[in-house]
Amino acid sequence: VTKKKKAHTAKNMKNKAEIIKFYQDIDWVDLLDKSDELNKAFQWIDKIIEEGIFRPAVLTTVNSLGEMIAKTNYVRSKNNQISIICVPSGIEKNKVVNAFNAILVDDYSGNLLNWSKAGGISIKYGYDKDYVSINSLGYFVSKGISKKLELALQ
């Protein structure tokens, strides 16, 4: 291993530690409560569950126990029936649940790439030219998603 590679790895590890520390220090209760996007998402999740076509679950990465507790309490305050699966940072989501033929909606492209490689269907929340992209979970209500999925599976 070259000195340059060791220095690069050390820098990445320092950055990763700083990122994890950043996420550990966030006031998750306040952040989640103030997120209009998340609150709107749960309005759609309720409709998706009601229709019975999909069985949604919350699959979320966590960096600390405090974040996990805050996210769990938040989700439970919005919907007490949905499954919540917390994935420790550094572990791929497809290693925790079976991705095969399952749909993952995620804003992080790295998760989507791993999910696709594991046989799952990846949908970008936001925009990414490499994935079917959505900006609302409303696409999963009725037949909104079917056209986008047809395009993705061609």
Label for each model-derived stretch:
Residues L59-A102, S109-L112:
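Substrate-recognition "cap/lid" segment bordering the active-site pocket of phosphatases
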Residues V1-V29, K117-A118:
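Active-site neighborhood of HAD-like aspartate-dependent phosphohydrolases
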Residues V58, L104-V105, I123-K124:
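A structural signal for short, well-ordered beta-strand segments and their strand-loop junctions
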Residues Q24-V58, L65-I69:
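Short, acidic loop-to-helix structural element flanking the phosphoryl-transfer center
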Residues N79, K95-N98, Y108-Q154:
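Asp-based, Mg2+/Mn2+-dependent phosphohydrolase catalytic module
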Residues I49-E50, R76, S116:
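N-terminal cationic-hydrophobic initiation segments that often serve targeting/anchoring roles
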